[in-house]
Design a protein with these regions (language model features):
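Short acidic active-site motifs
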Residues: 8, 71, 144-148, 167
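Short gly/pro/ser/thr-enriched loop/turn and capping motifs at secondary-structure boundaries
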Residues: 26-28, 55, 117-120, 187-189
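A contiguous loop/helix-start segment that scaffolds small-molecule binding in enzyme catalytic cores
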Residues: 150-213
Length: 213
């Protein structure tokens, strides 16, 4: 939803000549589509397509971060400001952080414009809090082993759940836990699931679960 973008994010995009997207092209970038809904001159800006591989191999990822950073720095050397678009908040499981570190270490200026984290948007959509009073809250990447994390006290946010949703559902049942889930929160394809039984075996990439004891 473009209206969920912060005023600072919108103003920053408006003031940048180059828009970088983590995709093969702007037509494949959800973040570009969202921003275009509120920044009216997006099509007049130069778009830099910077895709990243879907892998956990650190060597492959680090090589990609270096290559992406070089492409951005080329534009900076031309005297152009670059806005790198990302979904949610760039401090939470975002490719941008790795790129920013390389760019800053190379002597360029780079900053983070905070956004609304996906799990905050999910909780708001569900009409529930993430944590009350003294409750703990844990953010867990469910594409890795989650069983130990589920033993922690308090509520849990399971991110990156799509690729292992079937396994996640089984683990939650084994631990006698209940969960709610939103697929593509804030997008046209949004789907809300109020319990594990409603959840499909596979889901879209942007899928987040809220587990409350």
């Amino acid at each position: 939803d473009p209206k969920l973008m912060t005023y600072l994010a919108v103003e920053t995009i408006k003031n940048c000549e180059v828009i970088a997207v983590p995709a093969d092209g702007k037509e494949h970038a959800i973040s570009y589509k969202i921003a275009s809904g509120i920044v009216t001159d997006m099509n007049q800006k130069e778009c830099l397509a910077l895709s990243s591989p879907m892998t956990k191999d650190p060597n492959v990822l680090n090589e990609n971060y270096q290559n992406v950073s070089k492409e951005i720095m080329k534009k900076l050397d031309e005297g152009k400001d670059v806005a790198y678009l990302t979904l949610g908040d760039p401090t939470i499981y975002s490719t941008y952080i790795y790129i920013q570190r390389i760019i800053k270490e190379s002597g360029y200026e780079a900053e983070i414009i905070n956004g609304i984290p996906s799990f905050c948007a999910v909780a708001a959509k569900l009409g529930d809090s993430l944590a009350d009073r003294s409750e703990q809250l844990h953010i867990i990447p469910s594409s890795y082993d989650i069983e130990e994390a589920l033993e922690l006290p308090g509520n849990k946010i399971l991110m990156k759940a799509a690729s292992k949703l079937s396994d996640v559902k089984k683990i939650l049942r084994d631990h006698e836990l209940e969960a709610q889930m939103i697929e593509n929160c804030g997008m046209e394809e949004e789907r809300i699931y109020q319990n594990i039984d409603e959840m499909p075996e596979k889901a879209a990439y942007y899928t987040t679960l809220l587990v409350k004891k």
